[in-house]
UniProtKB/Swiss-Prot annotation:
<dbReference type="GO" id="GO:0019281">
    <property type="term" value="P:L-methionine biosynthetic process from homoserine via O-succinyl-L-homoserine and cystathionine"/>
</dbReference>
<keyword id="KW-0012">Acyltransferase</keyword>
<feature type="active site" description="Acyl-thioester intermediate">
    <location>
        <position position="142"/>
    </location>
</feature>
<keyword id="KW-0808">Transferase</keyword>
<dbReference type="InterPro" id="IPR029062">
    <property type="entry name" value="Class_I_gatase-like"/>
</dbReference>
<dbReference type="GO" id="GO:0004414">
    <property type="term" value="F:homoserine O-acetyltransferase activity"/>
</dbReference>
<comment type="pathway">
    <text>Amino-acid biosynthesis; L-methionine biosynthesis via de novo pathway; O-acetyl-L-homoserine from L-homoserine: step 1/1.</text>
</comment>
<dbReference type="GO" id="GO:0008899">
    <property type="term" value="F:homoserine O-succinyltransferase activity"/>
</dbReference>
<feature type="site" description="Important for substrate specificity">
    <location>
        <position position="192"/>
    </location>
</feature>
<feature type="active site" description="Proton acceptor">
    <location>
        <position position="235"/>
    </location>
</feature>
<keyword id="KW-0028">Amino-acid biosynthesis</keyword>
<feature type="active site">
    <location>
        <position position="237"/>
    </location>
</feature>
<comment type="similarity">
    <text>Belongs to the MetA family.</text>
</comment>
<comment type="function">
    <text>Transfers an acetyl group from acetyl-CoA to L-homoserine, forming acetyl-L-homoserine.</text>
</comment>
<feature type="binding site">
    <location>
        <position position="163"/>
    </location>
    <ligand>
        <name>substrate</name>
    </ligand>
</feature>
<feature type="binding site">
    <location>
        <position position="249"/>
    </location>
    <ligand>
        <name>substrate</name>
    </ligand>
</feature>
<feature type="binding site">
    <location>
        <position position="192"/>
    </location>
    <ligand>
        <name>substrate</name>
    </ligand>
</feature>
Length: 301
C-alpha cells in the first residue's frame, strides 16, 4: 500500500523517483481503506529534507498511511519558506481535538539549551501530554527523545565532553521485543549530538526498557512497557550524506572542536558508506505495524 501525501509536497517527486508508491489525497479518498494516521511534529531546521527522510522510511509499509505535518505555533522557522509551511503544516490548536494512530517528534539543534529555555517548550509539553490520550504510540528522535524522557519520566540530559558524531555499532539487548524483531545482533545507527541521557536516572525508571545500546554512543532505543512511548537517540532516518553535510557545515564555521564523523567513510576514502538503511527501514516498519496498526482500534471512541 502507498503513503498518502499532498500532491505538491516536494518529497513526492523524490520518493516516486525511488519507486516508492505514493498516492495523493484525492486518489486515496476513493479507496475503501482506513489509513493509518501519522502526525509528524517537525522541529528540524531543514523541514523538506526531514519530510523526505521520514516518508521514505515509512513508504515501504503494506499499510496505507496518511500524514499530517505539525509545527509549534510559538516558534517561527527560519530555514523553510512561509509558503511551504502554510500549505503543508498545521498547528496544535487545529488538531488537538483529533486522534492519531502514531506520532513522530523529530530532533532539533537546540541541545545546548535547557529544556525550559526552549521558546516552544510549554507548547511541546502540552503536545506530549495530549499524545498520552490521543495517540496510540509516539516515536521521539534524538533531541525529541531527550525532551520526551525529561517530560514523561524526569530523565535529564547531560553535556558530553566531545560530540557523539558518526555511525556506531549497536547491540540488541532485548531480543524478544517486537520493535527489534528481525534485527541482527549488531547493527548501525548514525548519531550527531553533544548531549546524552543520564543513565542513572534512566535505569531507575521501572516503566522503561532499554532495547539497544552502543559501547561508543550509549543507549539508543528505549521503549515504555506499554509501548506508547518510544525514544530513539540516534538518527536512522539520515540520508547517506547528511553527516557529511553537518561536518562540512561545522568546518565552515571554524569550530575548533570539529572532528570527522567516526566509522562513516569507506576505508582509505572520503566517500561515506550507508550501513544503516535496512535496519532503519525495519525499525520504522516494526513500529508502524506492531505499536501503531495492531494496537489501534478501527474506530476510536
Amino acid at each position: 500500500m502507498p503513503i498518502n501525501i499532498p500532491t505538491h509536497l516536494p518529497a513526492k517527486q523524490v520518493l516516486e523517483s525511488e519507486h516508492i508508491f505514493v498516492m495523493d489525497e484525492s486518489r486515496a479518498f476513493h479507496q475503501d481503506i482506513r489509513p493509518q494516521k501519522i502526525i509528524i511534529l517537525n522541529l528540524m531546521p531543514k523541514k523538506i529534507q526531514t519530510e523526505t527522510q521520514l516518508l521514505r522510511l515509512l513508504g515501504n509499509s503494506p499499510l496505507q498511511v496518511h500524514f499530517t505535518f505539525l509545527i509549534p505555533s510559538t516558534h517561527t522557522p527560519k530555514n523553510t519558506a512561509r509558503e511551504h509551511l502554510d500549505e503543508f503544516y498545521t498547528t496544535f490548536s487545529n488538531i488537538r481535538h483529533k486522534r492519531f494512530d502514531g506520532m513522530i517528534i523529530t530532533g532539533a539543534p537546540i541541545e545546548h539549551l535547557a529544556f525550559e529555555e526552549v521558546s516552544y517548550w510549554e507548547e511541546l509539553k502540552e503536545i506530549m501530554e495530549w499524545s498520552k490520550t490521543n495517540v496510540t504510540s509516539t516515536l521521539h528522535i534524538c533531541w525529541g527523545a531527550q525532551a520526551g524522557l525529561y517530560y514523561h519520566y524526569g530523565v535529564e540530559k547531560i553535556q558530553m565532553p566531545k560530540k557523539i558524531f558518526g555511525v556506531f555499532e549497536h547491540t540488541v539487548l532485548s531480543k524478544h521485543e517486537r520493535l527489534v524483531r528481525g534485527f541482527d545482533e549488531l547493527y548501525y545507527v548514525p548519531h550527531s549530538r553533544h548531549t546524552d541521557i543520564n543513565m542513572e536516572q534512566l535505569q531507575a525508571v521501572p516503566e522503561l526498557n532499554i532495547l539497544t545500546a552502543s559501547k561508543e554512543a550509549g543507549v539508543c532505543l528505549i521503549v515504555s512497557k506499554d509501548e506508547k512511548q518510544v525514544f530513539l537517540t540516534g538518527h536512522p532516518e539520515y540520508d547517506t550524506n547528511t553527516l557529511l553535510q553537518e561536518y562540512e557545515r561545522d568546518l565552515e564555521r571554524n569550530l575548533s572542536t570539529v572532528e570527522a564523523p567516526k566509522h562513516y567513510f569507506a576505508k582509505g576514502s572520503n566517500e561515506p558508506v550507508n550501513r544503516w538503511k535496512a535496519h532503519a527501514t525495519l525499525l520504522f516498519m516494526n513500529w508502524l505495524n506492531y505499536y501503531v496498526y495492531q494496537e489501534t482500534p478501527y474506530e476510536w471512541d
